[in-house]
């Protein structure tokens, strides 16, 4: 017998289904017309799109697609951040996967790169992280990793979505099997050992005072332990897992708290992670923000000087500061830009053979050590650079480059259709062209839709701060007038 979901994607099964199938495939919530998978998996508000029934069926259909790609199915790793909804979604995903006949290894609270690493270095056929990264507590997300630890391809994501929307057929026999769930939180120790092994054997943080903003999130157990093991004096902020407060006025997108703590404790440096610890932002002893552009420059320069950076190539995004790009070119390096999103950086790194890439927002990928952005690893290696240089992080940054004034503004769009087709707004396209002509080669304009939130992001960069302010205000006004109403 064959069963199928109804053509309208409601999730209701046809009348030929058995009691077994109905117990496994319950009614889906409303699915938006727009694609479910964004630049970083599926994101949304918990309790709206991201419900237990949705995660159950997502797990089931993901399991079916994953099983179809291998003759010897292994387990699926599931990790999660500290959000209140993460337990629910992780358990529902596990139920769906096991109802598809797969074994699930539950890792519990851990950073996203931990899931990627353990998936790559085990018999797992996939990894799943329950997290909405830097988003507020009421949001959540589900991101998938291939068996090699890289982000799930768009084609596989589409196959899974086709199942959810009723475009795949299954026999009853295919849904009559079930797997088991194993709880494996101690595997996180294997990831910590990998972090340790990636560092120079001679590295010591003795004498360093380091502040860590853990954002009430996934790094609370890993980051402090790693820095303390290296001998650093560690001051922790937001240091427990707290699902009500994750990312709230803290972490990598709210650096004022870290800056104040560094001044208060007269620390050498500090690091702020986001909720799932796949990104990091640093702050030096003077309170200056050391973002992904600075980290790429400093780490890239170190690799270049050692002959470990093929073609002197770095991969950045369209957000990378012009000051960074021109300083890097001054060292004989080249910078290739991609769209915003670490999956695009990763793809370009594979295509070009680049060993280091990342985003201004703090997603840094180094292929010498792994295949995913890793906030804790990046922080450890930046501390290693400081140790090896014999000078402070503040001194390294001071001698690197001066940034061009860059202003980023966000405009929220609740209308999904307007957000999806924003590029068809002719007044906005005309305004962008006007700004580009107005600044010429002295600046840049970037308007884009966020891949993770219902936002239009407007960025203007210019040698002249007044010009940057003028054009960003002008463009935001156009977006608010023609799209946000």
Swiss-Prot record:
Coiled coil: none annotated. Its EC number is 5.4.2.10. HAMAP family: GlmM_B. It is an enzyme of class 5 (isomerase). Keywords: Isomerase, Magnesium, Metal-binding, Phosphoprotein. InterPro entries: A-D-PHexomutase_a/b/a-I (IPR005844), A-D-PHexomutase_a/b/a-I/II/III (IPR016055), A-D-PHexomutase_a/b/a-II (IPR005845), A-D-PHexomutase_a/b/a-III (IPR005846), A-D-PHexomutase_C (IPR005843), A-D-PHexomutase_C_sf (IPR036900), A-D-PHexomutase_CS (IPR016066), Alpha-D-phosphohexomutase_SF (IPR005841). This is Phosphoglucosamine mutase. One of its GO terms (biological process) is UDP-N-acetylglucosamine biosynthetic process. Catalyzes the conversion of glucosamine-6-phosphate to glucosamine-1-phosphate. GO terms for cellular component: cytosol. Belongs to the phosphohexose mutase family. Binds 1 Mg(2+) ion per subunit. It catalyses: alpha-D-glucosamine 1-phosphate = D-glucosamine 6-phosphate. Activated by phosphorylation. Mg(2+) binds at residues 133, 274, 276, 278. The modification Phosphoserine is found at residue 133. GO terms for molecular function: magnesium ion binding; phosphoglucosamine mutase activity; phosphomannomutase activity. The active site is at 133 (phosphoserine intermediate).
């Amino acid at each position: 017998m064959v069963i199928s979901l109804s053509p309208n994607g409601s999730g209701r099964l046809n009348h030929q289904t058995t009691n077994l199938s109905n117990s496994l495939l319950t009614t889906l919530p409303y699915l938006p017309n727009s694609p479910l998978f964004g630049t970083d998996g599926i994101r949304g508000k918990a309790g709206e799109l991201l419900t237990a029934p949705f995660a159950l069926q997502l797990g089931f259909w993901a399991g079916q697609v994953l099983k179809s790609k291998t003759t010897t199915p292994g387990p699926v790793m599931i990790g999660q951040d500290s959000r209140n909804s993460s337990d629910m979604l992780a358990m529902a995903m596990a139920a769906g996967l096991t109802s598809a006949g797969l074994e699930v290894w539950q890792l519990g609270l851990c950073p996203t790169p931990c899931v990627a690493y353990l998936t790559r270095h085990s018999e797992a056929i996939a990894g799943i992280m329950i997290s909405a990264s830097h988003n507020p507590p009421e949001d959540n997300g589900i991101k998938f990793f291939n068996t090699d630890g890289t982000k799930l391809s768009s084609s596989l994501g589409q196959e899974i979505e086709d199942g959810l929307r009723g475009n795949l057929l299954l026999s009853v026999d295919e849904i009559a099997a079930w797997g088991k769930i194993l709880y494996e939180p101690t595997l996180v120790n294997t990831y910590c050992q990998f972090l340790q092994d990636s560092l120079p054997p001679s590295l010591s943080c003795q004498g360093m005072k380091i502040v860590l903003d853990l954002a009430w999130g996934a790094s609370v157990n890993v980051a402090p332990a790693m820095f303390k093991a290296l001998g650093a004096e560690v001051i922790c902020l937001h240091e427990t897992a707290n699902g009500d407060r994750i990312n709230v006025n803290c972490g990598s997108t709210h650096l004022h708290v870290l800056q104040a703590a560094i001044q208060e404790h007269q620390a050498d440096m500090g690091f702020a992670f986001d909720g799932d610890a796949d990104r990091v932002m640093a702050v030096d002893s003077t309170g200056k923000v050391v973002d992904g552009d600075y980290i790429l420059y400093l780490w890239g320069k170190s690799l270049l000087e050692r002959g470990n950076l093929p073609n002197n190539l770095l991969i950045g995004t369209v957000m990378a500061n012009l000051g960074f790009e021109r300083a890097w070119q001054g060292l004989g390096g080249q910078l290739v830009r991609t769209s915003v999103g670490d999956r695009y950086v990763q793809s370009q790194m594979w295509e070009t053979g680049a060993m280091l890439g990342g985003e201004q927002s703090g997603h840094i990928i180094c292929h010498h050590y792994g295949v995913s952005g890793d906030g804790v690893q990046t922080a450890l290696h930046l501390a290693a650079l400081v140790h090896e240089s014999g000078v402070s992080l503040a001194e390294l940054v001071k001698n690197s480059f001066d940034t061009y004034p860059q202003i980023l503004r966000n405009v929220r769009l609740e209308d999904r259709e307007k957000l999806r087709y924003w590029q068809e707004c002719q007044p906005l396209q005309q305004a962008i062209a006007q700004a580009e002509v107005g600044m010429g080669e002295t600046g840049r304009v970037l308007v884009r839709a966020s891949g993770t939130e219902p936002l239009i992001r407007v960025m203007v960069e210019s040698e002249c701060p007044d010009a940057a302010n003028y054009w960003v205000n002008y463009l935001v006004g156009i977006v608010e007038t023609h799209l946000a109403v």
